[in-house]
């Protein structure tokens, strides 16, 4: 009987041990440990799952991602982090750390997520907060890759304007602003690797989110930023924004021929500007004086002769300098005062002689371009575009309600 009891007891102990081992086998995965603080963390936010009609965007972004890996070869990894939030078609959303192990650059998936809309400001805020927690730094940068088109309100229509495109949904610039406040301090820079984002309305709306904003006033080249050249500039301290913009421009300028690109390098040009946020309130103040003095009724505003950046039906982006000079004349003293402030705000600007528009499928001249766009109001007071425009901080700061829609 005692022997039987011993056998039963031994069996129970063995069963308990096996159960414990199985419990350990199915425990929740161990969360990664936060990395120690570095000089700078840059979060590249890729929104490539735009729906079946735009699946080629994910293919372009996968090339961009590989170029980011190449760019990290030339970076001191002990002082920086390059983190990528990737939302591509035929893949789960994931947060990736591009790191160096010895001389090798590797992509380490830190987190994967259930399906979520990356253009929901709560999702974007959560990704930012997670990045800040696990990859703390003394300063931060943000890169946005997707479709976009300036400040216009979000819409459910495919290929309509605003910021980003996820399965034919978009994000308002005001929601984008709120999400970026999840960073613990203003960003060192925001790079918009997406179309038509170097607009004064966008820059002014985000002026408390970043020291510098980098982007194009018109459509960007299909391949996007040359990240093997641009990534090293993310982590420099002096003239960071200008060096990012210059690296972006110079690669395309090298290949520029003024012809429509086929296979091989993009030869159809590029334009890129960097804007200093701390000067934008002065630009708004001076622009409000110009508008108050020079603008009469809404119907008198003219677009003829001013550089056009936006070739869609919205027709929402024209050259800011060209608009102001058309109101005052370049010989006017007020214009010269305004232009001094404008030049202080636009710290870098460069363009090839022509750029390409995929909307009209041809090259167009950039000879009257100065790098920063503006909306020239037209149409009914209560049109969707004008109603949304009046909610933007730039519209309020320059007094359009008092001057035009009075």
Q: Where do the protein language model's features map onto the residues?
A:
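Bacterial Sec-dependent N-terminal signal peptides
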Residues: 16-39, 376-378
């Amino acid at each position: 009987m005692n022997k039987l009891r011993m056998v039963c007891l031994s069996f129970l102990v063995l069963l308990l041990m096996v159960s414990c081992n199985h419990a350990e086998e199915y425990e929740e995965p161990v969360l990664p440990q936060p990395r120690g603080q570095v000089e700078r963390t840059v979060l590249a936010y890729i929104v490539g799952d735009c729906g079946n009609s735009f699946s080629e965007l994910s293919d372009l972004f996968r090339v961009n991602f590989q170029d980011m890996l190449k760019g990290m070869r030339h970076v001191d990894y002990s002082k920086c982090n390059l983190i990528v939030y990737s939302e591509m078609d035929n893949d789960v959303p994931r947060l990736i750390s591009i790191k160096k192990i010895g001389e090798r650059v590797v992509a380490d998936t830190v987190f994967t997520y259930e399906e979520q809309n990356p253009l929901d400001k709560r999702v974007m805020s959560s990704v930012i907060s997670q990045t800040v927690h696990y990859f703390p730094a003394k300063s931060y940068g943000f890169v946005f890759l997707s479709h976009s088109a300036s400040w216009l309100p979000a819409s459910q229509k495919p290929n309509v304007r605003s910021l980003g495109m996820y399965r034919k949904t978009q994000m308002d610039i005001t929601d984008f602003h709120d999400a970026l406040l999840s960073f613990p301090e203003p960003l060192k820079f925001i790079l918009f690797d997406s179309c038509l984002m170097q607009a004064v309305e966008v820059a002014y709306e985000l002026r408390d989110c970043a020291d510098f904003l980098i982007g194009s006033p018109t459509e960007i080249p299909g391949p996007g930023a040359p990240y093997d050249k641009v990534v090293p500039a993310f982590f420099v301290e002096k003239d960071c924004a200008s060096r990012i913009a210059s690296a972006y421009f110079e690669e395309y300028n090298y290949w520029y021929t003024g012809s429509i690109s086929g296979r091989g390098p993009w030869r159809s040009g590029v334009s890129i500007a960097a804007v200093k946020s701390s000067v934008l309130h002065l630009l708004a103040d001076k622009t409000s004086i110009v508008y108050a003095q020079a603008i009469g009724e809404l119907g008198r505003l003219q677009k003829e002769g001013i550089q056009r950046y936006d070739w869609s039906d919205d027709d929402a982006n024209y050259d800011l300098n060209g608009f102001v000079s058309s109101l005052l004349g370049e010989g006017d003293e007020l214009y010269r005062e305004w232009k001094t402030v404008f030049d202080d705000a636009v710290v870098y600007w460069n363009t090839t002689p022509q750029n390409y528009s995929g909307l009209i499928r041809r090259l167009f001249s950039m000879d009257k371009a100065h790098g920063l766009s503006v909306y020239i109001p037209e149409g009914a007071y209560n049109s969707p575009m004008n109603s949304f425009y009046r909610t933007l901080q730039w519209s309020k700061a320059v007094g359009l309600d008092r001057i035009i829609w009075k």
